[in-house]
Amino acid sequence: MSSSNNSVVYWGTGRRKTSVARVRLVPGSGTITINGRPGDHYLNFNPAYLAAVKAPLQTLGLNEQYDVLVNVHGGGLTGQADAIKQGAARALCELSADNRKPLKTEGHLSRDPRAKERRKYGLKKARKAPQFSKR
């Protein structure tokens, strides 16, 4: 068995829209791996997505101390990035109870409830009605 199996692993689950991310924090050098691929490649080098993923670690100043291993599915890249952010924040809370307050004030622990509204019958989309003709 390798020595990496003996290290402490912190788990967190994050959700956003239809995305679900299972995040593991392992003591390391700060690399981000998403679904077996480097984080910047998976997120198409988009600075907004990368910033969202790194935000909880940067809030606590731990961005070079833990490797982030992520398994994420569902939704698009925006939802996945925000799900990873929430999962990482929850894993950091598991690391130490003192981390909860700064993460909460920055909004990393809040679940964003916005989701796609369902389409209603008689309408073209969720709220778009067919053109109204008075006569």
Curated annotation (Swiss-Prot):
A Pfam family per the record: Ribosomal_S9
Keywords, sorted A to Z: Ribonucleoprotein, Ribosomal protein
PROSITE patterns: RIBOSOMAL_S9 (PS00360)
GO-annotated molecular function: RNA binding; structural constituent of ribosome
Lineage top rank: taxon: Bacteria
InterPro entries, per the entry: Ribosomal_Su5_D2-typ_SF (IPR020568), Ribosomal_uS9 (IPR000754), Ribosomal_uS9_bac/plastid (IPR023035), Ribosomal_uS9_CS (IPR020574), Ribsml_uS5_D2-typ_fold_subgr (IPR014721)
GO BP, sorted A to Z: translation
Compositional bias segments (type: Basic and acidic residues): 97-115
An annotated GO cellular component: cytosolic small ribosomal subunit
Renumbered residue ranges of the record's region Disordered: 96-135
Biased composition range(s): Basic residues: 116-135
NCBIfam families xrefs: PRK00132.1
Protein family according to the UniProt entry: Belongs to the universal ribosomal protein uS9 family.
Protein's name according to its UniProt entry: Small ribosomal subunit protein uS9
Species: Prochlorococcus marinus (strain MIT 9313)
Gene that encodes the chain: rpsI
